[in-house]
């Protein structure tokens, strides 16, 4: 009996060990996702603080200064405040659409970060159709905004949702045509391959110089997709109170707030990856690949720093544009997208295609 009890204890110990290995393996698989989400949220907090500080300097006033050193925790304090606020719902309206609209907007944007290469071999999912996957996923966000506007049973909210859908459709087509031009130059739809294709010729190999027209169109279309001034028609305060956000409060209003900055950050990252060489540094005789081969941790850290530095440079341009240009009318916005950006982006694609065909 003692031998039998010993065998049972041995078997149980092996079962526990196997269970521990399975749990450890599961945690290890989800660790990159958790790290990416944590890094994204940290980047959003820094972005909110930067926008408030830069806006304060432009307006010659004092920005946030009480929540943490230099007010850097102000966004976190605002999030905690919204978390404990009452979550109101419209008495007459579609509560299902009203509830799931903000979640759809946030989740669709978060999934787009999976194809961003922050450094060499540091990408969550390197798909062969990475940039098209971003376009497909980001197209879901306006549906959430339209659902929120319709479910609120409010004329201002519904008009804001309609404007968001119309604006997204109008400016997503020129943006997609610019992506096609980039993919033709790089012979790939993978974000990693696009960055590596720009690294062959150093600073002058960036797509910023090879596709200057496409860069300007992509820049404008990205601001329109993010609903930033002068393209914030879906939530124009003077016309629609707060647009599709009018009836929201508490954490659901906070989700829209987070989704706006997540969208701005992902657009800036794609500008860096597609046009500014990604993680590559333009200093002669210094290559991130060589640094990575010598020391993987150091090379990866330098690559992340370069990517984020370029990203926040574009974010600075977006923030200053907010306080520089006046808002367009809805008819001006749609005419600008359909009658100006679309023909130019199509012509740019045809020129790029002709160049690639004749260079073969």
Swiss-Prot record:
Origin superkingdom: Eukaryota
Subcellular location: Plastid, Chloroplast thylakoid membrane
Family annotation (InterPro entries): NADH_UbQ_OxRdtase_su1/FPO (IPR001694), NADH_UbQ_OxRdtase_su1_CS (IPR018086)
Disulphide linkage map: none
First-tier enzyme category under EC: translocase
Residues that span the membrane, as ranges: 30-50, 98-118, 127-147, 165-185, 203-223, 248-268, 297-317, 340-360
Membrane topology: Multi-pass membrane protein
PROSITE patterns per the UniProt record, alphabetical: COMPLEX1_ND1_1 (PS00667), COMPLEX1_ND1_2 (PS00668)
Keywords tagged on the record: Chloroplast, Membrane, NAD, NADP, Plastid, Plastoquinone, Quinone, Thylakoid, Translocase, Transmembrane, Transmembrane helix
GO-annotated biological processes: aerobic respiration; photosynthesis, light reaction
One GO molecular-function entry: NADH dehydrogenase activity
Known catalytic reactions: a plastoquinone + NADH + (n+1) H(+)(in) = a plastoquinol + NAD(+) + n H(+)(out); a plastoquinone + NADPH + (n+1) H(+)(in) = a plastoquinol + NADP(+) + n H(+)(out)
Any single GO CC term annotated in Swiss-Prot or TrEMBL for this entry: chloroplast thylakoid membrane
Enzyme Commission number: 7.1.1.-
Complexes and interactors: NDH is composed of at least 16 different subunits, 5 of which are encoded in the nucleus.
Family statement: Belongs to the complex I subunit 1 family.
NCBIfam families: PRK06076.1-2
HAMAP family: NDH1_NuoH
Function: NDH shuttles electrons from NAD(P)H:plastoquinone, via FMN and iron-sulfur (Fe-S) centers, to quinones in the photosynthetic chain and possibly in a chloroplast respiratory chain. The immediate electron acceptor for the enzyme in this species is believed to be plastoquinone. Couples the redox reaction to proton translocation, and thus conserves the redox energy in a proton gradient.
Protein's name in the database: NAD(P)H-quinone oxidoreductase subunit 1, chloroplastic
